[in-house]
Amino acid sequence: MAKEDTLEFPGVVKELLPNATFRVELENGHEIIAHTAGKMRKNRIRVLAGDRVQVEMTPYDLTKGRINYRFK
């Protein structure tokens, strides 16, 4: 799948779940399950509840996503 096929939304981390997954509430009100991107894991960027993040999602499954940026 090409990079252009992804959708990006800002959101807020609501809850930390097992296996490095998070419950994220998007700005449009939807709640999704997201995991951190590999570069964030590699660089040991911590994501905690209440953090503002950018979530990347595929148009095929709008209930799961990948956190690719944590806003400062």
Swiss-Prot record:
Superkingdom of the source species: Bacteria
Entry keyword RNA-binding: yes
Cellular localization per UniProt: Cytoplasm
Keyword Metal-binding attributed: no
Primary location group: cytoplasm
UniProtKB keywords: Cytoplasm, Initiation factor, Plasmid, Protein biosynthesis, RNA-binding, rRNA-binding
GO molecular function, one term: rRNA binding
Pfam family, one: eIF-1a
InterPro entries: NA-bd_OB-fold, RNA-binding_domain_S1_IF1, S1_domain, TIF_IF1
Domain S1-like residues, every copy: 1-72
Protein name: Translation initiation factor IF-1
